[in-house]
Amino acid sequence: MHKFREYKINTPQERLYYNMYMNQTVDFVKSQHLKYSKLNNCTMKISEVLNVMDNFVDSSDPDTSLPNSIHAYQTAERIRKKYPNNKEYQITGLIHDLGKVLFKFGEPNWSVVGDTFVLGCELPKCIVYYDTLKDNPDFNNPKYNTKLGIYQKGCGLDKLKISFGHDEYLYQVLKQNKNHLLSEKYMNIIRYHSFYPWHTGGAYRIFMDQKDHIILKDI
């Protein structure tokens, strides 16, 4: 039986995560938020983004080699079968990975895909390929390598500097675009769906506030 999320050495996944850990830092996350905060790169329809994304290969995922558009339609269809009356959830399934359009703006794979994690505090051992994190420029910085780091207990996930990629980019697009009807619940599912160290690994609970416990149940 195939095991999902089985990460092996000497694979495209390991190479991508190594590059991610070498480059995703507190300063990088700040710079990416600043770089994309104006959302002035392009204007595209959902169908156009889905087509463009088929030119992108997600080398972080060991479980599927399907074109991105097929993955999007399959996800939406599976949700429709299980929740036929929940249109918001179906739309969320369709668009959840559209932030991968970042590759079209020249971003390398390591800044587009992969599990997300928090910069500016201790890096938990449940992170994929944890042993390669020692080469992260922030790893030995005493300001960033304590349990709380630069944050306060219970500050809320939205106060954390999470590694920047397709989830955060799409969340910011939705947050600044008032022409959609998705509620904050489904926007948060998009924002945190790759945050595996948190929702699956049990890390970062110390930072959660009351609303984050609701988000965790939703995810």
Describe each region flagged by the PLM.
Residues 34-70, 150-157:
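Active-site flanking loop/helix segments enriched in acidic
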Residues 1-51, 55:
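Non-catalytic interface/linker regions that flank or bridge core catalytic/transmembrane domains
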Residues 64-219:
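Divalent metal-dependent catalytic cores for phosphoryl transfer on phosphate-bearing substrates
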